[in-house]
């Protein structure tokens, strides 16, 4: 399993958002129990496994930053047709069984009505709240995409510079504060494998006790993993920003955020104000969930999230 909440795979190319026809309560007339069904499925999985939040956060991020939030990441590859899942950095994305279960239940109650893209959005939102994060509304009405091509996946690694990150987020209208909220918010839960932060283990600026701990943890076989948030690894809170200030960031991008003059004050604001962080993270998630969405007659409503209808 690769890094559970690898939001550090910052994107290179993003498409403009399409906001038309998305609205709160989109399914009130066609499938009233849609959001409650998804919420119940998510809770049942989260109650057994608290890493569900990290898994769904990563899933939504990796889906939305590649040609928009259209559930293209959910398509299974075949021998004749590879998909976004075929790309190495998507190999560790998990939680698909949660989406499958919700979709199966929804098809029994409201056939061909609720999109897989909306299920991912609702499920991620609910998992964040379960992990102590902000509760927020999301607009629905997304359609599922008709394309899932490995060549569309343009992802950078965890050593990306702040300047590169700012440029990428700016291309879709995200400001610096929103970027910091998304990166830190994604890293407040989940793990990173040792191969992804070898540069940090060698960094003398890292907290010496943590560096010694990481060296010991990474001696094991099969690329061991460690929590990115060493103090509250299953809670969506502002603790990750406190650790950045204390030179305890696991990933290079997180350490860069506190060292770069354009983001340092934002990290500090979030570190000492959990309410501010939660509000900013909720707003960032709402905005990210509307990147490049398909609405109206575009795309389709899949009956199986892992395969196109035709």
From Swiss-Prot:
PROSITE patterns: PEROXIDASE_2, PEROXIDASE_4. Keywords: Calcium, Disulfide bond, Glycoprotein, Heme, Hydrogen peroxide, Iron, Metal-binding, Oxidoreductase, Peroxidase, Secreted, Signal. Ca(2+) 2 binds at residues 188, 229, 232, 237. It catalyses: 2 a phenolic donor + H2O2 = 2 a phenolic radical donor + 2 H2O. Transmembrane segments: none annotated. It comes from the Eukaryota. Heme b binds at residue 187. Glycans are attached at residues 49, 175. One of its GO terms (cellular component) is extracellular region. Residues 1-20 form the signal peptide. The record marks 58 as: Transition state stabilizer. This is Peroxidase 8. Binds 1 heme b (iron(II)-protoporphyrin IX) group per subunit. Binds 2 calcium ions per subunit. Its EC number is 1.11.1.7. One of its GO terms (biological process) is response to oxidative stress. One of its GO terms (molecular function) is metal ion binding. Ca(2+) 1 binds at residues 63, 66, 68, 70, 72. Its cofactor is heme b; Ca(2+). The gene is PER8. Belongs to the peroxidase family. Classical plant (class III) peroxidase subfamily. Disulfide bonds join 31-110, 64-69, 116-305, 194-218. Removal of H(2)O(2), oxidation of toxic reductants, biosynthesis and degradation of lignin, suberization, auxin catabolism, response to environmental stresses such as wounding, pathogen attack and oxidative stress. These functions might be dependent on each isozyme/isoform in each plant tissue. There are 73 peroxidase genes in A.thaliana. It is found in: Secreted. SUPFAM superfamilies: Heme-dependent peroxidases. InterPro entries: Haem_peroxidase (IPR002016), Haem_peroxidase_sf (IPR010255), Peroxidase_pln (IPR000823), Peroxidases_AS (IPR019794), Secretory_peroxidase (IPR033905). The active site is at 62 (proton acceptor).
